[in-house]
């Protein structure tokens, strides 16, 4: 079969053997695959990522000297089954699958491991138990977007954001746009998006952002202030506390301590917005901690591949919650597909181009400095070799 192989940072279309599905696995004919930011990172930073993965107990992440078929966002149709499968779906049935697979009792990441070729190819092997049938009303293009949207779904759920909270999305690349869509699907009424790129800001509007800001012109937190009263100075917060306690103690005997505790436990005391960091560059987290209102919640979704620095004392003095998120759960993956099927999210809003296998390398170059493009898909049956 034809596949896009990554070796020492170079991408080339090569002929490689069609995978033979192992125990419990299914062979799919790839219909669409998405180019992920993780693939862009893996192409140039895979050795650093592999070292980090080893620290958390995973030793199969790709290395630069290996020949790896990338692609962990995909949809395909059933071709054949390996031994031990339940064979739940007929040949030709379209499936999405979590990109995790077992080979010889070793768990590997599909498309990010030499032993588990990904979906930048005509065929891909997946785990039967992690596969989900695609409803008839969901297009191939939308189905290929389930995986990155699941990352956003997980980030939104882990953030604890409520419908009445104001959410701020810093960075409107594919993950930032996905977070915007999942925030709106979760019922969050006010979503502020921030990006230097005019093209990305327009995509953010299309994906549902209620306010869009160019940070070179205006701070996104100024837009936040227009939505709700937040505190940016500690003195103002202390003053508010004095006023509240004076009011609570006007009537002698009022159990003010219990009232304050109840208010705090139920989110009724002053807080900041929920900020999603979707850039992944050095200095961004510290910038958010510095500029965001007091008691903000910061959710780090963007992957910074370089050592970074924050000022813990500043974060402590502002009582900022800092949370890092990774991946998603199987139920979130399935629910994301359900959201697409029911029209709660529209992945097509962020898909800006499709190429064939021969166009993958050129697409990587464009996406590395994208202004116009956000999400690009690969169609193995297409002859398109360049983005327009």
Identify the residue ranges that each predicted region occupies.
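C-terminal hydrophobic helical "lid"/dimerization subdomain
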Residues: 237, 248-252, 261-264, 282, ...
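Rossmann-fold dehydrogenase core element
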Residues: 297-299, 310-349
């Amino acid at each position: 079969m034809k596949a896009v192989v990554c070796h020492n940072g170079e991408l080339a279309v090569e002929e490689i053997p069609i995978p033979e599905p192992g125990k419990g696995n299914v062979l799919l004919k790839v219909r669409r695959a998405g180019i992920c930011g993780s693939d862009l990172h893996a192409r140039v930073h895979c050795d650093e990522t592999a070292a980090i993965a080893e620290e958390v107990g995973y030793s199969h992440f790709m290395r630069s000297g290996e020949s790896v078929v990338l692609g962990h966002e995909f949809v395909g149709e059933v071709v054949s089954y390996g031994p031990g499968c339940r064979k739940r779906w007929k040949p030709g049935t379209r499936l999405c699958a979590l990109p995790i697979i077992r080979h010889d009792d070793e768990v590997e990441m599909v498309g990010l491991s030499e032993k588990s070729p990904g979906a930048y190819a005509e065929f891909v092997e997946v785990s039967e138990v992690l596969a989900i049938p695609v409803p008839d009303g969901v297009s191939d293009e939308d189905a290929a977007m389930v995986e990155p949207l699941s990352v956003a779904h997980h980030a939104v759920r882990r953030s604890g954001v409520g419908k009445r909270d104001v959410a701020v999305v810093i960075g409107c690349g594919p993950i930032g746009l996905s977070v915007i869509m999942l925030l709106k699907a979760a019922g969050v009424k006010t979503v502020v998006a921030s990006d230097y790129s005019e093209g990305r800001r327009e995509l953010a509007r299309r994906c549902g952002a209620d306010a869009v800001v160019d940070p070179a012109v205006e701070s996104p937190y100024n837009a936040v202030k227009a939505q709700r009263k937040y505190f940016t100075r500690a003195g103002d917060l202390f003053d508010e506390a004095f006023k509240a306690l004076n009011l609570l103690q006007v009537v002698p005997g009022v159990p003010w301590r219990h009232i304050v505790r109840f208010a705090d436990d139920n989110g009724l005391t002053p807080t900041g917005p929920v900020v999603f960091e979707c850039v992944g560059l050095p200095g961004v987290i510290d910038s958010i901690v510095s500029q965001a209102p007091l008691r903000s919640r910061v959710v780090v979704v963007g992957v910074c591949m370089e050592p970074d620095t924050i000022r813990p004392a500043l974060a402590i003095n502002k009582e900022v919650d800092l949370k890092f998120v990774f991946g998603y759960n199987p139920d979130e993956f399935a629910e994301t597909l359900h959201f697409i099927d029911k029209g709660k999210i529209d992945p097509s809003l962020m898909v800006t181009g499709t190429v064939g296998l021969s166009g993958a390398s050129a697409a990587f170059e464009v996406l590395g400095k994208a202004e116009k493009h956000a999400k690009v898909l690969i169609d193995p049956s297409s002859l398109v070799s360049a983005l327009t």
